[in-house]
Amino acid sequence: MSAAHRFEGGCHCGNLAYVFEGSAGLDVLGLRADQCSFCRAHKNRTTSDPKGTMRIYVREPSALSRYRFGLGITDFLICARCGVFIGALMEEGDKAWFTVNANTFRPPPADDFPVAPVDYDAEDIPARIARRKRNWTPVAEFKLGA
């Protein structure tokens, strides 16, 4: 994958970091704005790539907050020190998928980058899991104590 499709980022204090390698740039992958109350409150702009890879590094595991709500099948990864939400993680056995909050890219996308509003409230658990497996980025590494 080209360096142009590599995005590095993390929380404000550096406790949570990641490397997202996409098969395409944001002009192809796009940005989404979920309309749930959590994402609206955080003004999230997320992206993912089922053909890409995600590597997540947690320096101090005790400062990683995993927040669950709604259907309770996804961990929203938040730094307990600085309060930044870096993305959502869905795990199943030894596999995991991630959608990343592009606002935590270094540098983040321009404020005027097009964002597609999305609403998944009508999905039941099987439909939501299937969509995420189809569309979210596979996690290649999730390292605690990095």
Please provide the spans of the model-predicted regions.
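A short Gly-Trp-Pro
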Residues: M1-G10, N15-A146
